[in-house]
Amino acid sequence: DDVRNVHWLSSAKTGSLMIRQYEATRRTDTALTISVNPDDYIDSQEFELAVSVHASIGVQCLQQNRPVTAHAGSTHAIPRNATEFLDGCSGIDPDIDDNPNLAQTTLEHAPDASFYFFTVGRLKTIDDIKHMVLALPRSATCVVLQAATGQPRAIKRYSDFTLATVGDLNDLPMIMGVLA
């Protein structure tokens, strides 16, 4: 044991060497961002799938007591519980004026998150996604969930992010299990 971990006062009182014990903890602040630009989606059904994916991820994080910062277009929130988060998700509507660089607006509100989830549609190109994640801190983990109604689930790892294709909401538990 390192001498810096010796609790000298307790050691002097007890007459034997007392070592500090630390509990391993890791705070995981999570930023959840969904693209609300309808140009990123094939149709309204795909947009609704994206909203459902976004909502499911947020609820899971909140149930695990992980702090969440949620972003949808110009709306930014720090929900305290799953009900509050789902209420916010019920108001997510398409917005053609949404900033295509989701990371830029996310970083304005959650610059120190350790985990970034971006939910986009299948029309968001891989080049756009790669450009988007460049701004994120290297120490953070980034997962891009691409809603693509009817497509087979898939996971592809890149150097700075992981891309998961979600063709059906029922695919999400398996995808998240692989990513865990």
Residue locations for each model-derived region?
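Exposed, interaction-prone extracellular/peripheral surfaces
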Residues: D1-A180
